[in-house]
Regions:
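Active-site cofactor/substrate anionic-group-binding motifs, chiefly glycine-
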Residues: 1
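ATP-dependent carboxylate-amine ligase
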Residues: 7-180
Length: 180
C-alpha cells in the first residue's frame, strides 16, 4: 500500500534518515505490476509507476503524497485518463487538472480523450508547464525525452487502457517488465 510506504518514508525522514537512503530502501520494495512500482532507469531517472487502475480517490491520494516528496531533480507528472467515469468524466478530469496544477510539479504530461477537461483544470490553477493530447504522440514523446534528465523523479498514473507504461519504456528502465 503506497500510503503506508509514504508514511514509513516520512517517519524515516523525520527521524533523520537521508532521502537517498530512503529512496534506495523503497526501490527494494516490490509490488504487483502497475501498482506503485519504483523503477530505476539507465539514465538515472527515478520513476513511480501506477498504471494498473485510476479513479478520483486513487489519483487524489497518490498525487498529494507524491507532491510532498523531496527529490534531487525535478518532479514530473505523467497522468493518463481515468476511464469509465461515465457522465462525470468531464467534471472529474477538470477537477484532476485543478489538483495536479495546484501541486508542485515542474512539468505535467496528460494523455487521454479528456485532455481538454484536464487542461481546463490546469488553467484554473494557473499552471503553465504542461503538454496534453489524446495519446502519446511523436511530438509529446520528443518533448518528454528532451525534458527528463538524470536525478528527475517521474510519477506516472493512469487507467490500464491508456497504456502509460509507454512513458516508462522511454526512460530505459532497468528493473522492469513492460509486458502486462
Amino acid at each position: 500500500n503506497i500510503v503506508n510506504l509514504m508514511a514509513a518514508a516520512t517517519l524515516a525522514y523525520a527521524v533523520g534518515m537521508q532521502p537517498e537512503k530512503i529512496w534506495h530502501a523503497l526501490a527494494k520494495c516490490h509490488s504487483t505490476w502497475g501498482r506503485n512500482q519504483f523503477i530505476k532507469t539507465k539514465n538515472q531517472v527515478d520513476i513511480l509507476f501506477d498504471g494498473y487502475n485510476a479513479n478520483p480517490d486513487s489519483m487524489n491520494a497518490l498525487i498529494k503524497n507524491v507532491s510532498t516528496l523531496e527529490v534531487q531533480g525535478r518532479k514530473v507528472a505523467v497522468i493518463g485518463q481515468m476511464r469509465e467515469m461515465g457522465s462525470k468524466a468531464q467534471e472529474l478530469h477538470e477537477e484532476l487538472g485543478l489538483l495536479v496544477g495546484s501541486q508542485k510539479f515542474d512539468q505535467v504530461f496528460f494523455i487521454g480523450e479528456n485532455f481538454k477537461d484536464f487542461e481546463a483544470g490546469l488553467k484554473k490553477a494557473h499552471y503553465q508547464n504542461y503538454l496534453v493530447d489524446t495519446d502519446l504522440t511523436p511530438s509529446m514523446k520528443e518533448v518528454f525525452l528532451n525534458y527528463v534528465k538524470p536525478q528527475d523523479f517521474v510519477f506516472i498514473k493512469g487507467s490500464r487502457g491508456i497504456k502509460t507504461e509507454r512513458f516508462v519504456d522511454l526512460c530505459e528502465p532497468l528493473n522492469w517488465n513492460s509486458k502486462y
